[in-house]
């Protein structure tokens, strides 16, 4: 059985790490490289960096900090932000990233997923999905351009359909960003995760809602996700990664202990 992964998420804007609530009202957390180094030393299995305004600004992720991160950490890391072409992806991978993640550009042109997977291999192609639960309809819908509140829009895709579509096109991993839960720290949306797990046959990463160690346990035990991504609880030092992993191990979760 593969070990479950604990993945700190660093949202990047204007060269700094920021964090919002439900993708809004972002506050500055700190500098990118020192935070990355800290999380690697604490025992993170992987890091994810989202340049949150790259797609909505029509630019690619700022490459200068990617190479700096690669120099100071020895764990895999994934970079997302405005990657719209094979050339964009090649540059970011050449600067030291292990994976690239696409979100809004994949919605704009789903063939991008296949082209990237064919060129670089499915193992390094992640598709991020920003999903919002509509209480009126009882359905989950995919959102686009979520890094800019003024441009965020609901797409025609229902989340479960898009999860299946991206797999057909070559996604090697899916990160499910549950927008309703983002930053509120009251737990992952387990019901949604279970539904997605049923149709997701590649590694599935839960994102949005972690507030306690128990929330991570629930995601692994009840929804059988492969990894749990979180930001606020790590940035604000509410949860220490080493202590979290020790707790999960005592609960019978297969986890890499540093």
UniProtKB/Swiss-Prot annotation:
Q: Which GO terms describe its molecular function?
A: imidazoleglycerol-phosphate synthase activity; lyase activity
As for subcellular location, the record says: Cytoplasm
Name the InterPro entries for this protein: Aldolase_TIM (IPR013785), His_biosynth (IPR006062), HisF (IPR004651), IGPS_HisA/HisF (IPR050064), RibuloseP-bd_barrel (IPR011060)
Keyword list (alphabetical) reads: Amino-acid biosynthesis, Cytoplasm, Histidine biosynthesis, Lyase
One Gene Ontology biological process? L-histidine biosynthetic process
Instruction: Give the transmembrane region(s).
Output: none
Task: Tell me its family.
Answer: Belongs to the HisA/HisF family.
Q: What is said about its interaction partners and assembly?
A: Heterodimer of HisH and HisF.
The molecule here is called: Imidazole glycerol phosphate synthase subunit HisF
Name the species this protein comes from.
Shigella boydii serotype 4 (strain Sb227)
Q: What is the lineage of its organism?
A: Bacteria, Pseudomonadati, Pseudomonadota, Gammaproteobacteria, Enterobacterales
Q: Which gene encodes it?
A: hisF
């Amino acid at each position: 059985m593969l070990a479950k992964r604990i993945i700190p998420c660093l949202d990047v804007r204007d060269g700094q790490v920021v964090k919002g609530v439900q993708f809004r009202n972002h506050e500055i957390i700190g500098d990118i490289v020192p935070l990355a180094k800290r999380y690697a030393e604490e025992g993170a299995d992987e890091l994810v960096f989202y340049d949150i305004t790259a797609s909505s600004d029509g630019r690619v992720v700022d490459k200068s900090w990617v190479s700096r991160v690669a120099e100071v950490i020895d764990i895999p890391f994934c970079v997302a932000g405005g990657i719209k072409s094979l050339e964009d992806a090649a540059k970011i991978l050449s600067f030291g990233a292990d994976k690239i993640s696409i979100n809004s550009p994949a919605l704009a042109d789903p063939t991008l997923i296949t082209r990237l997977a064919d060129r670089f291999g499915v193992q390094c192609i992640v598709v991020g999905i920003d999903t919002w639960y509509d209480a009126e309809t009882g359905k989950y819908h995919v959102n686009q351009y979520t890094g800019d509140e003024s441009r965020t829009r609901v797409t025609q895709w229902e989340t479960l359909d898009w999860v299946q579509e991206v797999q057909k096109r070559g996604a090697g991993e899916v990160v499910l960003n549950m927008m309703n839960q983002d930053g509120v720290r009251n737990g992952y949306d387990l019901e949604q995760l279970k539904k997605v797990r049923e149709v997701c046959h590649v590694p599935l990463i839960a994102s949005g809602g972690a507030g306690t160690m128990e929330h991570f346990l629930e995601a692994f035990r009840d929804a059988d996700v492969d990894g749990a991504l979180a930001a606020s609880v790590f940035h604000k030092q509410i949860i220490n990664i080493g202590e979290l992993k020790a707790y999960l191990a005592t609960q019978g979760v297969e986890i890499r202990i540093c």
